[in-house]
């Protein structure tokens, strides 16, 4: 029986023997494709080749790619753990041909690998082929079928519809028929009863797809029509975990050596055993799956956060924590303890797990602890919601309340339902679903983009010349229209461009495109699948005319200074804090720089000062730039160049060197460090567990900041009569102010006590109820304090109503003792109605409520209205 590691190696060895270049997995987190947050298929790293944006370096390629499917079209999240074969993070074994071999070889080698190398039983294999589509004018894929007939009986070759057997990259782009290979893993007696043919693509857990061979031969245009691709592409993907299940004779991916070490560790933590309780088993499968996703995302540079890809990772982590909390009794952080087990099983194939072990553990632990606190808060809010619902004689809480718990506190619906069931209550699921759909629709509307077809003026690829030029003669290769949020923009591709496209943390260049007829402003430059795209608000009237591409040199120079400063900052941080410091992110703009790095405690003021001094010393030394352009990656490593985790590097790289600072980098930089001028750190903060952030200014921005500080200092000196020792004067002022504040607080307490005593002497007893009412100018906090003090002294039959004015704003306050609340009085209902008389509104709890308004003249009437509504 092959282990997971042996299976992975055998695939690579087989395709290497067929002339394929074995390439490393690309990062799971995508940085230069606006259509994707995560790598969700093996082909993602080759999109620029498939789209024709860049020539293929190798015409035959194979790899094992880390993938993540949790959002968009490929969304497996809710199925994960509930079945035997869906996952969030998974490995995709794949082989590709870019204009080389096509269907015959792809099918032949797939069969050879599965049957001759892995020794899978050919009688248990089925292949699907595209049945055709009359509405698309597409015939059955008879070519693929004819090749399959060389290996399989005809009853093992199944026609598949467009949904199952026509693969598309998206709404537009390369596409084509595909041929899926399915395997029947059922026992012999089951196979004898029902043919596997009848179960293919019917979600049977033991008749599953293991390999998809995609034959890309068309391009889908924006008008939905198809045109032939100039160069045909083979793109295959085989689910590694499913293949291991088939080879190891298991009925579930989770029973293989890919997941079992994790599941056993989880079971041990929970004091249970896998296979004894289905709900517990689901929880263990969820956690085993999700810990892989979270760990690999962090190694690839994506930390949990509240935005975009970071929010997806946080959501996955919280889903795992919630399953552990709800079903396995894990009330403390536990997932971070699984990392050594994950490293033991996958560290050899993915050494980045080992290199970043400490960071991954700290991030996961802090995220767990934060969410557990949130869960406790959510439970308290749910307890209050249940109490209020019961007080109103109901047993069903509203879906809106449940959605607020979910949306604001990350409190999942199934946990809400579980707690409600334990208390004999339910939730209105239809209302919850309606709220969820409204939120999704709002998100879809906000993100909706209409992208037109490329208008191709001439074929070609873009050459970036921006390292050497800021102006360059060029022409347009293609353009298209893009609509988003009621704005129409244009994306332009040039044959030569000096414009730097946003990447590596550095924002894109701006500038103009100039020809003899007009000037077009370039408002941004982005990368899409490594293709530089120039964004404009209008198109040239003569797009075929030659033009000059001119970069805004002031902004470029400011960006270059800030980017070079991040390199110096990185080196200085490692010198001051230690070699554990690694860059975790950056943002380089013309105005400032932001640098995220691994460090496990706050950087002290003294350490920041040392860092700043080291950077500025190197600036004063005016160290010249040494650019190593397009050198072999091994040569770069020999230089000692620092690479970033989560970045994908080619065989040849660019290295930026300022003396002892040596880094892989594709950004723009100053010719010598003296051009930076000066660096001033303006803030240091925490981004996530184990990750700190420094923000800084350079050059002219430092001068502006120093000017502002000097002006502020001058104003302060003037306020203190130009005293020679401003610090002493300010401290004296603060101390005196604190003393006066204390006197005011003491006075207010005396006033509160006096008012309370006066009110106690003037209690009116009406039908056995002790009524205290008044209208006075008084701060809201004082009224509240008095009300609660009175409630403590008059424990039964207290009815307190006050109309007060503070800063010309009227306030209505009602306090009721518990026995009156039990009798049916509700303070919140009373103030809500009476507040109309002061042109306001409010509410609160049954025993205490307040309302604000705009009309102080209505206070007396409002107080009387409260008494009237209460029947007093």
Curated annotation (Swiss-Prot):
The keyword Cell wall biogenesis/degradation does not apply. Gene3D superfamilies: 2.40.30.130, 3.10.310.40, 3.30.54.20, Bira Bifunctional Protein, Domain 2, Threonyl-trna Synthetase, Chain A, domain 2. GO terms for cellular component: cytoplasm. InterPro entries: aa-tRNA-synth_II/BPL/LPL, Ala-tRNA-lgiase_IIc, Ala-tRNA-ligase_IIc_anticod-bd, Ala-tRNA-synth_IIc_core, Ala-tRNA-synth_IIc_N, Ala-tRNA_ligase, Ala_tRNA_ligase_euk/bac, DHHA1_dom. This is Alanine--tRNA ligase. It is an enzyme of class 6 (ligase). Its main location: cytoplasm. PROSITE patterns: AA_TRNA_LIGASE_II_ALA. GO terms for molecular function: alanine-tRNA ligase activity; aminoacyl-tRNA deacylase activity; ATP binding; tRNA binding; zinc ion binding. Zn(2+) binds at residues 563, 567, 665, 669. Pfam families: DHHA1, tRNA-synt_2c, tRNA_SAD. Its cofactor is Zn(2+). The lineage of its organism: Bacteria, Pseudomonadati, Bacteroidota, Bacteroidia, Bacteroidales.
């Amino acid at each position: 029986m092959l282990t997971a590691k042996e299976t992975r190696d055998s695939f690579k060895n087989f395709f290497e023997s067929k002339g394929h270049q074995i390439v490393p997995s690309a990062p799971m987190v995508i940085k230069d494709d606006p259509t994707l947050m995560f790598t969700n298929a093996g082909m993602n790293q080759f999109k620029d080749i498939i789209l024709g944006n860049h020539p293929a370096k190798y015409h035959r390629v194979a790899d094992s790619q880390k993938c993540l499917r949790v959002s968009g079209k490929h969304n497996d999240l809710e199925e994960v753990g509930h079945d035997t074969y869906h996952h969030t993070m998974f490995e995709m074994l794949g082989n590709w041909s870019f204009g080389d071999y096509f269907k015959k070889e792809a099918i032949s080698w797939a069969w050879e690998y599965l049957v001759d190398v892995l020794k899978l039983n050919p009688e248990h294999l089925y292949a699907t082929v595209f049945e055709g589509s009359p509405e698309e004018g597409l015939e059955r894929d008879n070519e693929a079928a004819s090749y399959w007939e060389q290996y399989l009986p005809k009853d093992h070759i199944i026609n598949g519809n467009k949904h199952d057997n026509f693969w598309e990259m998206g709404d537009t782009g390369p596409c084509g028929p595909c041929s899926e290979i399915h395997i029947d893993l059922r026992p012999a007696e089951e196979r004898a009863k029902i043919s596997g043919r009848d179960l293919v693509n019917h979600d049977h857990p033991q008749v599953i797809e293991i390999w998809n061979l995609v034959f890309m031969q068309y391009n889908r245009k924006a008008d939905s029509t198809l045109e032939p691709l100039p160069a045909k592409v083979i793109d295959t993907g085989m689910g590694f975990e499913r293949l291991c299940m088939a080879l190891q004779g298991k009925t579930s991916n989770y029973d293989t050596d890919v997941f079992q070490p994790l599941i056993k560790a989880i079971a041990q933590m929970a004091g249970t055993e896998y296979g004894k309780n289905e709900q517990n088993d689901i929880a263990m499968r969820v956690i085993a799956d999700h810990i892989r996703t979270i760990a690999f995302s962090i190694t690839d540079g994506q930390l949990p956060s509240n935005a975009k890809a970071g929010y997806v990772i946080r959501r996955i982590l919280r889903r795992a924590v919630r399953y552990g909390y709800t079903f396995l009794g894990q009330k403390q952080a536990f997932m971070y303890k699984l990392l050594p087990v994950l490293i033991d099983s996958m560290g050899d194939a993915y050494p980045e797990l080992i290199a970043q072990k400490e960071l991954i553990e700290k991030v996961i632990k802090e995220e767990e602890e934060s969410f557990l606190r949130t869960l406790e808060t959510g439970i308290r809010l749910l307890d209050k919601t249940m109490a209020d619902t019961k007080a109103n004689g109901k047993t069903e809480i509203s879906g809106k309340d449940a959605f607020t718990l979910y949306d604001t506190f990350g409190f999942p619906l199934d946990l809400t339902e579980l707690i409600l069931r334990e208390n004999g209550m339910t939730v209105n699921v239809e209302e919850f679903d309606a709220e969820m759909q409204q939120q999704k629709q709002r998100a879809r509307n906000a993100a909706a983009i209409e992208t037109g077809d490329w208008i191709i003026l001439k074929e070609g690829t873009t050459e970036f010349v921006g390292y050497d030029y800021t102006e360059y003669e060029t022409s347009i290769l293609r353009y298209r229209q893009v609509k988003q949020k009621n704005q129409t923009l244009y994306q332009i591709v040039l044959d030569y461009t000096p414009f730097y496209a946003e990447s590596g943390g550095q924002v894109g260049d701006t500038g103009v495109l100039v020809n003899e007829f007009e000037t077009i402003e370039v408002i941004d430059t982005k990368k899409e699948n490594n293709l530089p795209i120039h964004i404009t608000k209008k198109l040239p009237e003569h797009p075929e005319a030659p033009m000059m591409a001119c970069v805004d040199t002031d902004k470029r120079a400011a960006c270059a200074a800030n980017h070079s400063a991040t390199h110096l900052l990185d080196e200085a941080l490692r010198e001051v804090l230690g070699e554990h410091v690694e860059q975790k992110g950056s943002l380089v703009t013309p105005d400032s720089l932001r640098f995220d790095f691994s460090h496990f405690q706050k950087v002290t003021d003294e350490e920041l000062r040392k860092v700043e001094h080291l950077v500025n010393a190197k600036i004063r030394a005016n160290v010249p730039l040494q650019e190593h352009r397009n050198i072999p990656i091994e040569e770069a490593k020999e230089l000692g160049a620092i690479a970033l985790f989560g970045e994908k590097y080619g065989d040849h790289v660019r290295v930026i060197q300022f003396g002892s600072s040596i880094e892989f980098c594709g950004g723009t930089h100053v010719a010598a460090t003296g051009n930076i001028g000066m660096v001033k750190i303006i803030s240091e903060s925490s981004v996530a567990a184990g990750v700190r952030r420094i923000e800084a200014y350079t050059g002219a921005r430092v001068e502006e900041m120093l000017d502002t500080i000097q002006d502020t200092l001058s104003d302060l000196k003037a306020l203190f009569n130009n005293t020679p020792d401003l610090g002493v004067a300010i401290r004296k002022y603060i101390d005196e102010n604190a003393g006066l504040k204390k006197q005011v607080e003491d006075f207010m307490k005396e006033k509160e006590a006096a008012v309370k005593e006066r009110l106690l002497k003037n209690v009116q007893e009406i039908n056995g109820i002790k009524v205290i009412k008044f209208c006075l100018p008084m701060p809201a906090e004082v009224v509240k304090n008095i009300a609660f003090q009175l409630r403590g002294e008059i424990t039964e039959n207290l009815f307190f109503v006050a109309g007060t004015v503070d800063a010309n704003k009227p306030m209505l306050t009602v306090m009721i003792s518990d026995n009156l609340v039990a009798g049916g009085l509700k303070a919140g209902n009373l103030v809500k109605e009476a507040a109309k008389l002061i042109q306001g509104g409010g509410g609160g709890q049954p025993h205490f409520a307040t309302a604000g308004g705009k009309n102080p003249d209505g206070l007396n009437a409002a107080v009387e209205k409260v008494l009237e509504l209460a029947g007093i």
